[in-house]
Amino acid sequence: MSSTPSNQNIIPIIKKESIVSLFEKGIRQDGRKLTDYRPLSITLDYAKKADGSALVKLGTTMVLAGTKLEIDKPYEDTPNQGNLIVNVELLPLAYETFEPGPPDENAIELARVVDRSLRDSKALDLTKLVIEPGKSVWTVWLDVYVLDYGGNVLDACTLASVAALYNTKVYKVEQHSNGISVNKNEVVGKLPLNYPVVTISVAKVDKYLVVDPDLDEESIMDAKISFSYTPDLKIVGIQKSGKGSMSLQDIDQAENTARSTAVKLLEELKKHLGI
């Protein structure tokens, strides 16, 4: 079983005291203010063999997301919708405690949060992925790989997922007497996305709340709360992690900070996506 850095007590007490003493002055180890996000870069179409892909670098955290489309049957309870399947892998090269093998509970949790944010926001219109109602639909496989764990991997996974979906090509479907097939030589458009979604994480360290915690900050945090937003700032996902607790006042303050951060991050994401 792999364990995430936030579960490892790897920061000496002296270093924690040093980090918190900087918080008292309103700054962090890397020079950021408590409410600042790390530098973000997004490279679209990074994996050429995928139908869509994006490489996201958030500080030292690096995540690659790729998509593949295939014709499939709809689920029985959603005959008029396409399918979305999200997988996240914490690669062993990303951090020293990550182990090879099937996804562990940390990877599964990340996949569920990303999936829930995309579904509950209706960012991806699954009804437009229907080829033949009740018979055939597009299944979107969204695979997310954490390549370098430098903290706050959830926000990076959401960014990479959304960017990869926006980058995804949809190919022509051809009807035959014996069924249907995909013509990979003819692109007919992109996935039917309504708008982007972002996730903003805020960590509680001692009495301080910090946006986009890095690896050291996650290692000493008491708890973390993550909010997912649509462009109209509707909350479409909330996830709390860490062993410590957060008061209602902490949560309210964290949400206010996350909301204002989401406005800026959504604008930056839109510029990268050209929308």
UniProtKB/Swiss-Prot annotation:
Family annotation (InterPro entries): ExoRNase_PH_dom1, ExoRNase_PH_dom2, ExoRNase_PH_dom2_sf, Exosome_comp_Rrp42_subfam, PNPase/RNase_PH_dom_sf, Ribosomal_Su5_D2-typ_SF, Rrp42_archaea
Tell me yes or no: is Cytoplasm among this UniProt entry's keywords.
yes
Keywords carried by this UniProt record: Cytoplasm, Exosome
Q: Subcellular localization, per the record?
A: Cytoplasm
Q: Which family is it part of?
A: Belongs to the RNase PH family. Rrp42 subfamily.
A GO biological process this protein is involved in? rRNA catabolic process
Query: Briefly, what is this protein's role?
Result: Non-catalytic component of the exosome, which is a complex involved in RNA degradation. Contributes to the structuring of the Rrp41 active site.
- PANTHER family linked: EXOSOME COMPLEX COMPONENT RRP42, EXOSOME COMPLEX EXONUCLEASE RIBOSOMAL RNA PROCESSING PROTEIN
Q: Which GO terms describe its molecular function?
A: mRNA 3'-UTR AU-rich region binding
Q: What is its main location?
A: cytoplasm
Q: Name one GO cellular component term.
A: cytoplasmic exosome (RNase complex)
Q: Which NCBIfam families match?
A: PRK04282.1-1
Describe what happens upon changing residue 112 to E: Abolishes exoribonuclease activity of the complex
What does the record say mutating residue 218 to A does? Does not change activity
- How is this protein named in the record? Exosome complex component Rrp42
Q: What is annotated about its quaternary structure and interactions? A: Component of the archaeal exosome complex. Forms a hexameric ring-like arrangement composed of 3 Rrp41-Rrp42 heterodimers. The hexameric ring associates with a trimer of Rrp4 and/or Csl4 subunits.
